[in-house]
């Protein structure tokens, strides 16, 4: 898929004089001058990282800052992410992306090998969603802006969705939502960066893991361990789907001096943190965890405030990495095409 554009990126600005005719333009290429100016801005706002004691405070109290965030904003800050089904078909009902025969064959295949091993473990140690045939987990679920669209749109009777966040406030907001159903979903508090914390499901049991603007909130020194732990939960053929902040995104360039924790890692005014990735950063993390690249694409988007005649350059990265199959069967699991 290298070089092939994914589903986003269908509105191109060919005539700069038309920039204010739409709210956003996709796949906007930067000039050398823009790239140089962005690099200079990052150098300026990163020249003096915060003292180590302050960095440790933000690390040790990370969940508290996110609790405060969700206490203030509840479910009003983020919009539901219905665009996910266009970008990541793996989150839709399997019947909507496969023929009936293919779907049945995929389910039969999943009962072989690793799936049988998981089911034997189910009998000995039952876990939430043990009887499901397709399991999705979202890490850093917040108040459910990804989880609930999945539950609403994916009617697969074999689906079970896990969602976790290290903010207990966020998890309680998920559980109190009228769309939350324990028969189809299990929400739990979990710090994915803590290697001592255990997951409620066994290894090799998940088909899809979703990371939407989540990995960037984790200390870069802990990211490799996080991805490796998550990789161990995937079935062969399962995948991790990611969308996150890219290097020189508008949000990075807006940071003032005194907010930098480490190279390309910052703390916001509310105490929450954010890292800005390159494609190579993410490729190294996933490949080192034993996963194979299906997609690793930069989404450079020009957002426009037509009322104020302002332009804002956003940079996001979208990835799909797959756990290698243990057999030559390629049906089911995550698509590599």
Curated annotation (Swiss-Prot):
EC number of this enzyme: 2.1.1.-
UniProt entry keywords in alphabetical sequence: Cytoplasm, Methyltransferase, S-adenosyl-L-methionine, Transferase, tRNA processing
Catalytic activities: cytidine(32) in tRNA(Thr) + S-adenosyl-L-methionine = N(3)-methylcytidine(32) in tRNA(Thr) + S-adenosyl-L-homocysteine + H(+); cytidine(32) in tRNA(Arg)(CCU) + S-adenosyl-L-methionine = N(3)-methylcytidine(32) in tRNA(Arg)(CCU) + S-adenosyl-L-homocysteine + H(+)
InterPro entries found in the cross-reference section: Methyltransf_12, METTL2/6/8-like, SAM-dependent_MTases_sf
Key word Ribonucleoprotein present: no
GO CC terms in record: cytoplasm
Residues where S-adenosyl-L-methionine binds: 66, 70, 140, 165, 191, 212
GO molecular function, one term: tRNA (cytidine) methyltransferase activity
Segment forming the signal sequence: none
UniProt subcellular location: Cytoplasm
Annotated Pfam families: Methyltransf_12 (PF08242)
Domain of life: Eukaryota
Family membership noted in the UniProt record: Belongs to the methyltransferase superfamily. METL family.
Function: S-adenosyl-L-methionine-dependent methyltransferase that mediates N(3)-methylcytidine modification of residue 32 of the tRNA anticodon loop of tRNA(Thr)(UGU) and tRNA(Arg)(CCU). N(3)-methylcytidine methylation by mettl2 requires the N6-threonylcarbamoylation of tRNA (t6A37) by the EKC/KEOPS complex as prerequisite.
Quaternary structure note: Monomer.
Protein name (record): tRNA N(3)-cytidine methyltransferase METTL2
């Amino acid at each position: 898929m290298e070089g092939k554009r994914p589903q986003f990126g269908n509105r191109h600005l060919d005539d700069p004089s038309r920039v204010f005719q739409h709210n956003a333009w996709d796949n906007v290429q930067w000039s050398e001058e823009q790239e140089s100016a962005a690099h200079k801005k990052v150098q300026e706002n990163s020249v003096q990282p915060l003292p180590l004691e302050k960095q440790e405070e933000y690390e040790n109290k990370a969940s508290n800052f996110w609790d405060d965030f969700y206490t203030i904003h509840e479910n009003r800050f983020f919009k539901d992410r219905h665009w996910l089904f266009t970008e990541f078909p793996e989150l839709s009902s399997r019947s909507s992306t496969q023929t009936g025969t293919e779907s049945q064959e995929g389910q039969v295949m999943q009962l072989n090998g690793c799936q049988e091993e998981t089911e034997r473990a189910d009998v000995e140690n039952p876990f939430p969603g043990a009887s499901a045939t397709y399991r999705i987990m979202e890490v850093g679920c917040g108040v459910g802006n990804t989880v609930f669209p999945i539950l609403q749109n994916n009617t697969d009777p074999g689906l079970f969705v896990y969602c976790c966040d290290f903010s207990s406030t966020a998890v309680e907001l998920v559980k109190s939502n009228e769309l939350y159903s324990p028969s189809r979903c299990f929400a739990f508090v979990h710090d994915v960066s803590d290697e001592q914390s255990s997951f409620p499901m066994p290894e090799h049991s998940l088909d899809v893991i979703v990371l939407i603007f989540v990995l960037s909130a984790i200390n870069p020194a802990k990211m490799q361990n996080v991805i490796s732990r998550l990789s161990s939960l995937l079935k062969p053929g399962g995948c991790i789907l990611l969308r996150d902040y890219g290097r020189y995104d508008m949000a990075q360039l807006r940071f003032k001096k005194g907010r930098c924790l480490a190279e390309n890692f910052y703390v916001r005014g509310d105490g929450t943190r954010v890292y800005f990735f390159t494609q190579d950063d993410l490729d190294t993390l996933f490949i080192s965890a034993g996963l194979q690249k299906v997609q690793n694409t930069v989404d450079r988007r020009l957002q426009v405030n037509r009322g104020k005649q302002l332009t804002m350059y956003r940079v996001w990265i979208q990835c799909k990495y797959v756990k290698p199959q243990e057999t030559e069967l390629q049906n089911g699991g995550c698509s590599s095409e």
